[in-house]
């Protein structure tokens, strides 16, 4: 049985989470794995960097004077902190649209202080609080720039959603005819493809010019640099993606997805990592990711010390007392083709 991530209450094993891991180089060669690296996965928000590439490819980011922090924000699953909300509002202002044009829905933001402030002021939740509002503002920027229909931008038949599908097909080397499409939590199309191909996408995001010399590579490079330069826009305070990119200081690009997905690209080795927690529980993702990085020899103890809360995540009770821990217990398998290369 795959009991890769273990949850302890005191010293007693209470729960386990199975995981799947694919580690791929920029050529698409599987280097390491655990579980089923070909498991079909909805990567969810992990695809946001590639959705951002589709925006850049239209010329919209340049036309509307996107700074790096804007590019990073359209890759975000943000916490709804004030600087995130202000960033989305700034983008909407540049394209002369209103918050009501965002079709992402809304929810209580991860940043509870922002929510408490909203309640104290007698306000109500609006789309800008959605963790996907940055992505949607990016999509709308491309749609406005291309003079396309704004109301239908979420539909898979919309030209911009087809551009996104093409980017994913190209970067992940998986035919779009075989990509299953469903609807993400924020209402836009979400794409299902093998974990191995998702990892390939992140290898190419990390080192695009080792893959090919093209406009797509240039756009991947631009998006990756923006995320690493402004990791606070991608997640926020006390978020794994943000903290990982900040601590590794422009070596790693990282993006989580709902239902237990975590993806990472390493600029130095050119490796792409994709992780899926089988039961979809996100509490296992950072612990699994840090163990994968450790086994790959990416980083050192000084960096890991700064990320200790993600290596062995604490289990807290309602009083915020530490009453348990979440740990990793698995060994990556080195693939034969990697041994021979």
Predicted regions and their residues:
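Short glycine-rich loop/turn motifs
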Residues: 16-21, 137, 165, 259-262
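Bacterial peptidoglycan biogenesis and beta-lactam-recognition machinery
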Residues: 57-64, 96-99, 146-152, 158-165, ...
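Beta-lactamase-like hydrolase cores
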Residues: 1-38
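A short glycine/serine-rich beta->alpha loop
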Residues: 34-42, 74-78, 122-130, 182-189, ...
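Short Gly/Pro-enriched turn/cap motifs at secondary-structure boundaries
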Residues: 10-13, 129, 251-255
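Active-site SXXK
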Residues: 43-61
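Active-site-adjacent helix/loop patches that line small-molecule binding or acyl-intermediate pockets
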Residues: 1, 67-174, 178
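Structured C-terminal helix/loop/strand segments within mature extracytoplasmic catalytic/sensor domains
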Residues: 205-341
């Amino acid at each position: 049985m795959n009991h890769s991530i273990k949850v302890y209450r005191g010293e007693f094993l209470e729960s386990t989470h199975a995981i799947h891991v694919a580690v791929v180089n920029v050529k698409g060669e599987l280097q390491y794995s655990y579980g089923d690296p070909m498991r079909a996965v909805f990567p969810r928000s992990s695809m946001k960097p590639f959705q951002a590439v589709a925006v850049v490819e239209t010329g919209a980011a340049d036309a509307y004077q996107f700074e790096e922090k804007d590019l990073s924000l359209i890759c975000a699953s943000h916490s709804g902190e004030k600087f995130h909300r202000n960033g989305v509002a700034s983008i909407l202002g540049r394209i002369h649209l209103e918050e009501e044009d965002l079709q992402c829905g809304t929810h209580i933001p991860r940043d509870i202080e922002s929510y408490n402030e909203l309640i104290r002021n007698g306000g109500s939740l609006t789309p800008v609080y959605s963790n996907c509002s940055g992505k949607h503002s990016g999509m709308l920027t491309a749609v406005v720039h291309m003079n396309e229909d704004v109301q239908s931008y979420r539909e898979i038949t919309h030209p911009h959603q087809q551009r996104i599908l093409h980017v994913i097909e190209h970067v992940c080397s998986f035919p779009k005819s075989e990509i299953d499409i469903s609807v993400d939590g924020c209402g836009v199309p979400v794409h299902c493809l093998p974990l191995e191909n998702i990892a390939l996408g992140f290898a190419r995001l990390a080192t695009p010019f080792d893959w090919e010399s093209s406009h797509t590579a240039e756009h991947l490079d631009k998006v990756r640099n923006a995320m690493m330069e402004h990791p606070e826009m991608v997640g926020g305070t006390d978020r794994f993606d943000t903290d990982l990119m900040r601590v590794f200081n422009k070596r790693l690009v990282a993006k989580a997805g709902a239902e237990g997905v975590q993806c990472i690209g390493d600029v130095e080795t050119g490796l792409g990592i994709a992780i899926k927690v089988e039961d979809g529980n996100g509490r296992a993702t950072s612990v699994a990711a840090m163990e994968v990085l450790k086994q790959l020899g990416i980083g050192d103890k000084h960096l890991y010390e700064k990320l200790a809360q993600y290596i062995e995540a604490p289990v807290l009770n309602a009083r915020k007392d530490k009453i348990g821990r979440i740990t990793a217990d698995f060994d990556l398998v080195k693939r034969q083709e990697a041994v021979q290369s």
